[in-house]
Design a protein with these regions (language model features):
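Short, flexible helix-loop junctions that flank or precede catalytic/ligand sites
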Residues: 1-347
Length: 347
């Protein structure tokens, strides 16, 4: 099988990822589990050539110099793929993450109603967090799409690499990729403030300068979407503040308290019937109570504020998991595996 056939097989089987690893058969991740494809093992040359053939010259140069590279590419009529090519102890390796060609709506994702409201906020910072593979990009794409369909404005995305490709609808959308279009997230963000955006998506807030510029953009009247790999709202606030030197922490807490609109922390859970996965969310909104807790460095008290904020659209992850179990969507065992307090999910 060539790479196109392998990727077509992967998409047909609803795999989120295709793994190629020298010395082993190709494998796919379906509903969270990695399974072998019933074909022969691939040697180093086969994996190397499959990946090398779909790279452009600049990607090959990065791969040869650094021994790894991130990029995205599209097979017309099939899907887009985010690729990480690397080297390992048996030879070449690569992972292809499937990015559906069609962007799902918030309704199709069965996202909480508050997500649509957050997508249309005039300013402030909305963070979607969670581990790798938790569906952050899918959620953000749906929120950007909702904004694009409902508001006349300028949406600017900065990604590494570009994943979901948006068409300009009511809004003008410009998508920039780190590498081909800009040297770094921080460079692109610095320029963004001079590019008349209403909304800026920062694919990954991975360093101090990017976080500082994203906060500044939110403070100066822009809607900023960003992602972090944190697992809860409280850890997200701590992560942002902890990046800064001690002398700046108090000022940063004040900036975060003023600009933070919401933190959505999500985790993917296997459906009880085994046919797929569903996202469970912790949702923290920037209420006056939450803003005060951030400003006063009382992050530990956030959880109880989220717990009691259901009427405002807030929920803890465990509250959402309880609801999913009650509705027979996921099993108690799956909820227990994802919960903050597993003891609340016996059985």
């Amino acid at each position: 099988m060539d790479i196109t056939q392998l990727l077509a097989f992967s998409v047909k089987n609803k795999a989120s990822d295709l793994h190629l690893s020298a010395g082993l058969p190709p494998m796919i991740r379906v509903h969270g589990d990695v399974r072998r494809i019933n074909v022969e093992a691939l040697d180093h040359r086969a994996v190397h050539d499959m990946v090398y053939d779909i790279m452009n010259d600049s990607q090959r140069k990065v791969y040869e110099e650094t021994l790894e590279v991130d990029f995205s590419f599209e097979i017309q009529g099939l899907a887009r793929f985010r690729v990480n090519a690397f080297n390992q102890n048996r030879g070449a390796g690569a992972v292809f993450r499937t990015i559906p060609s069609k962007i799902l709506s918030l309704e199709q994702l069965a996202a909480p109603k508050v997500f649509a409201d957050l997508a249309l906020k005039p300013r402030g910072m909305v963070l979607v967090t969670g581990p790798t593979g938790s569906g952050k990009s899918t959620t953000l794409a749906a929120m950007i799409n909702h904004l694009n369909e409902n508001e006349y404005g300028h949406i600017l995305t900065i990604e590494d690499p570009i994943e979901f490709v948006h068409e300009s609808k009511k809004s003008l959308i410009n998508q920039r990729e780190v590498g081909p279009h800009t040297h770094s997230f921080s460079n692109a963000l610095r320029s963004a403030l001079r590019e008349d955006p209403d909304c800026v998506l920062v694919g990954e807030m991975r360093d101090l300068e990017t976080i500082r510029l994203a906060l500044t953009a939110a403070e100066t009247g822009h809607l900023v979407f960003g992602t972090l790999h944190t697992s809860s709202a409280a850890k997200t606030v701590d992560r942002i503040v902890d990046v800064f030197p001690a002398a700046e922490k108090e000022m940063v807490r004040a900036m975060v308290s003023e600009s933070l609109v919401a933190v959505i922390s999500q985790s993917l859970c296997k459906l009880k019937d085994g046919t797929g996965r569903v996202a469970a969310h912790e949702i923290m909104l920037g209420t006056s109570a939450i803003r005060n807790l951030i400003r006063e460095n009382k992050v530990a008290q956030m959880y109880s504020s989220i717990q009691t904020g259901n009427s405002l659209g807030m929920q803890t992850l465990d509250q959402n998991l309880t609801d999913l179990v009650r509705r027979n969507i996921i099993s108690p065992a799956e909820a227990r595996a994802k919960a903050k307090f597993p003891e609340n999910f016996p059985g």
